[in-house]
Amino acid sequence: MIAARLAAVAALMAATACAARAPERPVGAAAEAPDAVQTLIGITAHCRPLRTATAEIRLSGRAGRERVRARLVSGFAAPASLRLEALAPFGPPALVLVSDGANTTLFFPREEQVLREAPVAAVLDALTGLALDASDLRRLLFGCVVGEGGRGLRYGSAWQVVEDGDTRAFLKNGVLVAADYRGWQVDYAAHQGGIPRSVRVRRALPAGALDLVATLASVEINVDLDAAAFTVAVPPGAAAITLDDLRAASPFAPPAP
């Protein structure tokens, strides 16, 4: 059973093209620029509020020792609900991760294996190295990493930066192109209606680098989502697995001797 589950996770790992070069960050001396905060507020109007969001996601890049390619169907609802389905070429999904903020389930339909009550961030960390909870992932994907406060700075004529605690949002020529968010480097591109359709996430981790690009399509925000969207029907006979089992299949796990 464990071998089958490992195969399901491995099905998400495949050769893919290298990620595109990221936009550079500004360098040099900064000047105070309170207007940068208002500029950011104006171009991220969809974030206030970002009550719900759905999108199809094509994920590519590298996680640890593995190249990654996956197709996901995603749904999010504030404050901490999510649904991620990793689609297979045919038949049932490779996996389904759901959480309503209180209860979290990871289900492998093909193997009928289930992990219950592990934190969302721990599950995503084991699968991809992206250790974010549902709320942080929603904000990161849709470019809502900074609120309405913060300190505005300007670098030269093109760059504006908004700092808010440990988060920095980078605007180039009035467009949100990057962010440093809770230790993650994020690059945004291909905006439509202010929402980025290409999101690159990078971080150097002790077990290897993470460099993933999420390409978003069919994006809808603030639509009504039924609470059932954040649950999954698990057959009574599904075999229970542990977070340690999942970590053993992680692309960041040490290779077997």
Describe each model-derived feature in a short phrase.
Residues 77-135:
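An acidic-aromatic
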Residues 150-257:
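Gly/Pro-enriched, hydrophobic low-complexity segments
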Residues 72-76, 97-99, 187-191:
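Extended lipid/amphipathic-ligand handling interfaces
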Residues 56, 67-73, 79, 185:
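Beta-strand-dominated lipid-handling architectures at cellular/organellar boundaries
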Residues 58-64, 89-92, 106, 111, ...:
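Hydrophobic lipid-interacting interfaces of membrane-associated proteins
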Residues 1-18:
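Sec-dependent bacterial lipoprotein signal peptides
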Residues 18-69, 111, 234, 241, ...:
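N-terminal leader/targeting segments and the immediate start of mature chains
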